[in-house]
Regions:
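Rossmann-like NAD(P)(H) cofactor-binding subdomain of soluble oxidoreductases
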Residues: 1-39
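Glycine-rich, flexible loop/turn motifs
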Residues: 23-29, 36, 68, 76, ...
Length: 177
Protein backbone atom coordinates (compact mmCIF):
# COMPACT_ATOMS: atom_id res chain seq x y z
CA UNK A 1 0.00 0.00 0.00
CA UNK A 2 1.17 3.57 -0.59
CA UNK A 3 2.65 5.34 2.40
CA UNK A 4 0.79 8.33 3.81
CA UNK A 5 2.41 11.72 3.31
CA UNK A 6 4.49 13.19 6.12
CA UNK A 7 5.24 16.78 7.04
CA UNK A 8 7.47 18.31 9.65
CA UNK A 9 7.12 21.63 11.43
CA UNK A 10 10.80 22.66 11.59
CA UNK A 11 10.75 25.98 9.77
CA UNK A 12 14.41 26.05 8.73
CA UNK A 13 14.67 22.46 7.46
CA UNK A 14 13.73 21.37 3.93
CA UNK A 15 11.24 18.59 3.20
CA UNK A 16 14.23 16.31 2.49
CA UNK A 17 14.70 16.07 6.26
CA UNK A 18 12.04 13.37 6.05
CA UNK A 19 13.82 11.22 3.47
CA UNK A 20 13.24 8.41 2.48
CA UNK A 21 9.48 9.09 2.79
CA UNK A 22 8.27 9.65 -0.78
CA UNK A 23 5.62 12.31 -0.14
CA UNK A 24 6.93 14.89 2.28
CA UNK A 25 6.68 18.55 3.06
CA UNK A 26 6.99 21.36 5.55
CA UNK A 27 3.99 22.84 7.34
CA UNK A 28 5.33 25.46 9.73
CA UNK A 29 3.24 27.87 11.80
CA UNK A 30 4.76 31.34 11.99
CA UNK A 31 3.99 31.52 15.69
CA UNK A 32 5.83 31.22 18.98
CA UNK A 33 4.98 28.19 21.09
CA UNK A 34 6.23 28.94 24.62
CA UNK A 35 4.55 25.77 25.94
CA UNK A 36 3.51 22.44 24.45
CA UNK A 37 -0.14 23.33 25.05
CA UNK A 38 -0.12 26.73 23.35
CA UNK A 39 -3.00 26.67 20.86
CA UNK A 40 -2.56 27.87 17.29
CA UNK A 41 -3.92 31.41 17.10
CA UNK A 42 -6.51 32.21 14.44
CA UNK A 43 -4.96 34.05 11.49
CA UNK A 44 -1.56 32.44 12.09
CA UNK A 45 0.44 32.20 8.88
CA UNK A 46 1.69 28.72 7.97
CA UNK A 47 4.63 28.30 5.64
CA UNK A 48 3.94 25.43 3.24
CA UNK A 49 6.68 23.72 1.26
CA UNK A 50 5.49 20.60 -0.54
CA UNK A 51 4.75 19.20 -3.95
CA UNK A 52 1.24 18.57 -5.24
CA UNK A 53 -1.16 17.18 -4.16
CA UNK A 54 0.21 17.48 -0.59
CA UNK A 55 0.55 21.28 -0.85
CA UNK A 56 -3.17 21.62 -1.67
CA UNK A 57 -4.06 19.40 1.28
CA UNK A 58 -1.89 21.47 3.63
CA UNK A 59 -3.37 24.75 2.39
CA UNK A 60 -6.89 23.35 2.91
CA UNK A 61 -6.00 22.15 6.42
CA UNK A 62 -4.52 25.56 7.23
CA UNK A 63 -7.73 27.29 6.13
CA UNK A 64 -9.82 24.87 8.22
CA UNK A 65 -7.86 26.10 11.24
CA UNK A 66 -8.81 29.69 10.36
CA UNK A 67 -5.23 30.42 9.39
CA UNK A 68 -3.42 31.57 6.25
CA UNK A 69 -0.98 29.59 4.12
CA UNK A 70 2.03 30.95 2.23
CA UNK A 71 3.87 28.78 -0.29
CA UNK A 72 7.63 28.62 0.25
CA UNK A 73 10.52 27.26 -1.78
CA UNK A 74 12.79 24.86 0.10
CA UNK A 75 15.76 27.18 -0.42
CA UNK A 76 13.92 30.03 1.32
CA UNK A 77 13.09 28.09 4.49
CA UNK A 78 16.19 29.21 6.46
CA UNK A 79 15.48 32.87 5.57
CA UNK A 80 11.80 32.48 6.47
CA UNK A 81 12.61 30.82 9.79
CA UNK A 82 15.36 33.33 10.64
CA UNK A 83 12.82 36.15 10.21
CA UNK A 84 10.52 34.43 12.70
CA UNK A 85 13.30 33.84 15.22
CA UNK A 86 14.67 37.37 14.94
CA UNK A 87 11.23 38.98 15.26
CA UNK A 88 10.55 37.15 18.51
CA UNK A 89 14.05 37.52 19.95
CA UNK A 90 14.29 41.26 19.24
CA UNK A 91 10.83 41.84 20.70
CA UNK A 92 11.52 39.91 23.89
CA UNK A 93 14.94 41.49 24.33
CA UNK A 94 13.33 44.92 23.96
CA UNK A 95 10.69 44.07 26.56
CA UNK A 96 13.45 43.02 28.97
CA UNK A 97 15.75 45.99 28.31
CA UNK A 98 13.04 48.63 28.45
CA UNK A 99 11.32 46.95 31.38
CA UNK A 100 14.55 47.10 33.40
CA UNK A 101 14.80 50.77 32.58
CA UNK A 102 11.28 51.37 33.92
CA UNK A 103 12.02 49.46 37.14
CA UNK A 104 14.77 52.02 37.77
CA UNK A 105 11.97 54.62 37.71
CA UNK A 106 9.92 52.80 40.37
CA UNK A 107 7.81 50.39 38.32
CA UNK A 108 7.49 46.86 39.65
CA UNK A 109 8.73 44.20 37.23
CA UNK A 110 5.17 43.20 36.33
CA UNK A 111 4.11 46.84 35.85
CA UNK A 112 7.14 47.49 33.66
CA UNK A 113 6.56 44.41 31.52
CA UNK A 114 2.86 45.23 31.10
CA UNK A 115 3.58 48.86 30.23
CA UNK A 116 6.20 47.98 27.62
CA UNK A 117 4.02 45.22 26.11
CA UNK A 118 1.02 47.57 25.90
CA UNK A 119 3.16 50.24 24.24
CA UNK A 120 4.50 47.71 21.75
CA UNK A 121 1.04 46.28 21.08
CA UNK A 122 -0.22 49.72 20.05
CA UNK A 123 2.76 50.30 17.78
CA UNK A 124 2.44 46.83 16.26
CA UNK A 125 -1.28 47.36 15.59
CA UNK A 126 -0.47 50.59 13.76
CA UNK A 127 2.38 48.91 11.84
CA UNK A 128 0.01 46.15 10.77
CA UNK A 129 -2.61 48.66 9.62
CA UNK A 130 -0.41 51.24 7.91
CA UNK A 131 3.16 49.90 7.79
CA UNK A 132 6.17 50.36 10.07
CA UNK A 133 7.04 53.89 8.88
CA UNK A 134 3.53 55.14 9.69
CA UNK A 135 3.72 53.56 13.16
CA UNK A 136 6.96 55.30 14.10
CA UNK A 137 6.63 58.07 16.68
CA UNK A 138 9.02 59.80 19.03
CA UNK A 139 12.01 62.11 18.89
CA UNK A 140 13.78 60.42 15.98
CA UNK A 141 10.70 60.68 13.81
CA UNK A 142 10.27 64.35 14.78
CA UNK A 143 13.94 65.17 14.31
CA UNK A 144 14.11 66.15 17.99
CA UNK A 145 17.86 65.88 18.61
CA UNK A 146 17.59 67.62 21.99
CA UNK A 147 15.38 64.88 23.43
CA UNK A 148 17.67 62.17 22.06
CA UNK A 149 20.63 63.89 23.75
CA UNK A 150 18.74 64.12 27.07
CA UNK A 151 17.90 60.42 26.84
CA UNK A 152 21.53 59.49 26.19
CA UNK A 153 22.78 61.71 29.02
CA UNK A 154 20.44 59.97 31.48
CA UNK A 155 21.32 56.40 30.48
CA UNK A 156 24.22 54.26 31.66
CA UNK A 157 26.58 52.94 28.99
CA UNK A 158 24.75 49.63 28.48
CA UNK A 159 21.34 51.24 28.04
CA UNK A 160 22.76 54.08 25.94
CA UNK A 161 24.30 51.53 23.56
CA UNK A 162 20.98 49.69 23.28
CA UNK A 163 19.14 52.98 22.66
CA UNK A 164 21.60 54.02 19.93
CA UNK A 165 21.32 50.56 18.32
CA UNK A 166 17.53 50.97 18.15
CA UNK A 167 17.86 54.44 16.60
CA UNK A 168 20.36 53.13 14.04
CA UNK A 169 18.07 50.26 13.13
CA UNK A 170 15.21 52.67 12.47
CA UNK A 171 17.44 54.94 10.39
CA UNK A 172 19.03 52.05 8.48
CA UNK A 173 15.58 50.78 7.52
CA UNK A 174 14.52 54.23 6.31
CA UNK A 175 11.59 54.39 8.74
CA UNK A 176 12.12 57.92 10.07
CA UNK A 177 10.42 60.66 8.09
Amino acid sequence: PPRPPAVHCAGASPPDALSPIATRGVWHPLMAFPTRTTPVAPSTVFGVCAGEPLACRLVALTRQLGCRAVSLDAGDLPIYHSAAVEAVHRTLASVEICGRRLTRCGFSESEATAAVCDLMAGSLRRAREAGPAAALTGPLDRGDVGTVRRHLAALDDEHAASYVDALRLVLDQGLAR
